[in-house]
Amino acid sequence: MKILASDFDETIYYLDDPEKNKMNCEAIRNFVANGNIFCIITGRNYTDLKQLLIANNIPYSYLICEDGAKIFNNMDYCLDTVLLDENDIKQIVQIIEEYNWDYYLDDGYNHTNNYNDCVKIVINCIDEDDKRKTVDIIKQRTNVHIYASRTHVNIIHRSVNKKHALQKLINLEKLDYNNLYVIGDNDNDYEMLKSFNGAVMKRHNPILNELGKKEYESLKDYIEELMNN
């Protein structure tokens, strides 16, 4: 039995490539049908992700959402949550309002106004220079985990990343580290790719080059290789 933890966007799912989506989803179904464990690990919240999983008929053993702040089993029971500190939220919101940035708080399922039940702050931002400036400003004034994705700047608790979430999952569910493989394409995949056996998508963030991981054209190709070895 093998355990595969895969990033979602631009690894499993592509907005602009339905044919690749179809091939990846078929490969995932085959992987799970053969008794393997499949975990999706993503920056998306549970609600957004679940809608796409249903629409594309994607099976899973575990979901790790919000970059590791929420962990679910295949019954959608939440195994673990890491909230942002209320004081951190207040400090960050103050900075955001100083600069008049567009943002929302996320509780892991939906937008929220509750500072006591927030796992992520999301700042809407598309321009690359603006994203870098936003990250730098917040890094200088707070102690949180912050990174830029394609259309957002994402802020989570300082202890949260995909690597730590996978370590938690393995301990909670008594899984075998030696059977774990990971795959991703972006900088929020860096820690898990550095720590576990795995691969990167051919189209990936250049920051992952230093890890020296084998590149794959599609998730389907990687799954087929795992199943044949």
Features from the language model and the residues they span:
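Asp-based phosphoryl-transfer active-site loop
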Residues: 2-18, 193
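Conserved acidic, metal-coordinating active-site core of Asp-based
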Residues: 95-195, 203, 210
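Active-site phosphate-binding/coordination module
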Residues: 15, 19-109
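The start of beta-strands in P-loop NTPase/AAA+ ATPase cores
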Residues: 2-4, 61, 180
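Non-catalytic pre-domain segments flanking phosphatase-related domains
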Residues: 1-6, 26, 172-175
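Conserved Rossmann-like nucleotide-cofactor binding loop
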Residues: 11, 46, 188
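Hydrophobic/aromatic beta-strand patches that form the interior of the parallel beta-sheet core
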Residues: 39, 64, 181-183, 199, ...
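Asp-based, Mg2+/Mn2+-dependent phosphohydrolase catalytic module
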Residues: 176, 195-229
